[in-house]
Amino acid sequence: METAAFETDLSLFKYDNLEQLPPSYRDLDADERTERIESALAELGDDVVILGHNYQRQEIVEHADFIGDSYQLSKEAAQSDADYVIFGGVTFMAESADIITDDDQSVILPSMEASCPMAGMAEALQVDAAWAELTAALDDEEIIPITYMNSYADLKAFCAEQGGLVCTSSNAHKAFEYAFEKGDKVLFLPDKHLGENTAHRLGMADETVEWDPWDAEGTDAADAVENDVILWEGYCQVHERFREHHIESIREDYPDANVIVHPECRREVVEAADVAGSTSTICESVAEADPGETWAIGTEIHLTHHLQRWHPDVNVVPLCGDACMDCNAMRQIDPNYLAWVLEELVEGRERNVIEVAPEEKELAQVAMDRMLEI
């Protein structure tokens, strides 16, 4: 494997031109902040819609018009007539909303620092270099790229250009089936665990290999293309934390517990759980549970806390107890930022607007449309 000099060109904060929180907003107390947010929302009325991701803290979710996963929220944005879409999520989510909303709608991400680390693990420079190596190593076979929704718009656009598509954690298996109808091999980005779990679900567990763009001694391209599924070395830091011993401990403490985990978890964790599914699946499973049932949740801790509040008759417990993590990127959407961007809109000023370049936007839409077709 060859490695390129990425260090000077890569940045976790893709939108590092966005503005920071003004000093006057940094020390707002909770009561004043809530009052100011509600006042601004009352003045803006139907001109604004707030989207709250399942992983957001309660102080954001309580002001949200819609709560859900990233793709659900993007669809809600597209169906809204609001001029301003405030996304309580991370950068790639705001990009996805901008891709599918009308051009006259503005998508606002309150904090520039809400950048998903996993999305940043597969940047265009790295993917272009890997693609050149992999395709050069192929003879007559074709490789189809699939990117998880948790990726930047430029990666979605790349996949469209190369005949690939986008997937969610719910339809990744369908994306794989589509890709193997069109080609011979799959490059799955950026989450290796979702890719591996999907390959395992389709009976391809022994046909995968990892591709690490940072490892000069890693898999050679000629060796990589001997496998049907090439998994990009990316992962969610929250979900990778879960281990089998967490499930073993839960089963000791709660013998009748139902263990449900996100498919971004390691394969051995997914196999040891009772159910694996998207955040929507997790929410639906708890909502449909009988009173008194115990559900151990293997995902970001704020969703577990929401489920505890929403379903007090169900015993909802975090899979790894106090060791369960919140998403650091989601944490950057501080409610003080929400107060700031709302009050700026009241004054006629748009702050921290996420705009995907037109050509990139058009191609990314193609990749997302292919997903909808399956």
From Swiss-Prot:
Gene Ontology BP annotations: 'de novo' NAD biosynthetic process from L-aspartate
Cofactor note: Binds 1 [4Fe-4S] cluster per subunit.
Binding site for [4Fe-4S] cluster: C116, C236, C327
Pfam families from the UniProt entry: NadA
Molecular function in Gene Ontology: 4 iron, 4 sulfur cluster binding; metal ion binding; quinolinate synthetase A activity
Known pathway: Cofactor biosynthesis; NAD(+) biosynthesis; quinolinate from iminoaspartate: step 1/1
Cofactor(s), names only, from the UniProt record: [4Fe-4S] cluster
Broad class of where this protein is predominantly found: cytoplasm
Alphabetic keyword roster: 4Fe-4S, Cytoplasm, Iron, Iron-sulfur, Metal-binding, Pyridine nucleotide biosynthesis, Transferase
Protein location: Cytoplasm
Alphabetical list of InterPro entries matching this protein: NadA, NadA_sf, Quinolinate_synth_A_type3
GO cellular component: a single term: cytoplasm
Enzyme class: transferase
Reaction(s) catalysed (UniProt annotation): iminosuccinate + dihydroxyacetone phosphate = quinolinate + phosphate + 2 H2O + H(+)
Sites where the protein binds iminosuccinate: H53, S70, Y148, M149, N150, S169, H262, P263, E264, T279
EC number: 2.5.1.72
Listed PANTHER family: QUINOLINATE SYNTHASE, CHLOROPLASTIC, QUINOLINATE SYNTHETASE A
Family: Belongs to the quinolinate synthase family. Type 3 subfamily.
NCBIfam families: nadA, PRK09375.2-4
Functional description taken from the UniProt entry: Catalyzes the condensation of iminoaspartate with dihydroxyacetone phosphate to form quinolinate.
Protein name as catalogued: Quinolinate synthase
Organism expressing this protein natively: Haloarcula marismortui (strain ATCC 43049 / DSM 3752 / JCM 8966 / VKM B-1809)
Gene: nadA
